[in-house]
Amino acid sequence: MPKKFQGENTKSAAARARRAEAKAAADAKKQKEPEDAYWKDDDKHVMRKEQRKEEKEKRRLDQLERKKETQRLLEEEDSKLKGGKAPRVATSSKVTRAQIEDTLRRDHQLREAPDTAEKAKSHLEVPLEENVNRRVLEEGSVEARTIEDAIAVLSVAEEAADRHPERRQRAAFTAFEEAQLPRLKQENPNMRLSQLKQLLKKEWLRSPDNPMNQRAVPFNAPK
């Protein structure tokens, strides 16, 4: 009988070694991923922290600069009030936005302010309104010597003052309709609204409330 081979198969050993190496690499990668993620996240926090620190320092420096500028302006103002010379301080040529806005606002107020030389017109400068009755007398050469003449003059003056009754006709008709339409509905319950409005219009043409009819009525006509 031939002897049994007791040595190790090199191919099998190499395959097992490769599998073990691949498994070890996969395990190492798997273990490293959480650590990398942790440090990556920690780097973000560090960057944000540094950014906040820089912004805070910038705000502090800006506030300090504004305080120095305010103090300088107060010292200059105080020196001017006392009549002394303002201290010679090396000022920055940079103009702040607040100073620009303040200058523009003052300039706008000066432009919008009314001219002090322009005064309100006195009662002597305002033209007097024309007396209608006097104009009627002058134009028509009517002189009121009696009561009847005065009534006639007033009637002419009233007619001259109200030459456009049609301008008041719409408002007068609206008031007439609101007052008379309920009565017509009660007296004619079977009529439609269009019929009632036709009837109302006929009454309006004859009504003394119509400005067109008032124009033709003489001033001293009996009521």
Swiss-Prot record:
Coiled-coil intervals, chain numbering: 44-82
Modified residue annotations for Phosphoserine: S141, S194
GO term, biological process aspect, one: cell division
Stretches the record annotates as Disordered: 1-126, 204-223
Known partners and oligomeric status: Associates with translationally inactive ribosomes in the nonrotated state. Interacts with RASGEF1B.
PANTHER family for this protein: COILED-COIL DOMAIN-CONTAINING PROTEIN 124 (PTHR21680:SF0)
Role played: Ribosome-binding protein involved in ribosome hibernation: associates with translationally inactive ribosomes and stabilizes the nonrotated conformation of the 80S ribosome, thereby promoting ribosome preservation and storage. Also required for proper progression of late cytokinetic stages.
Full protein name: Coiled-coil domain-containing protein 124
Originating organism: Pongo abelii
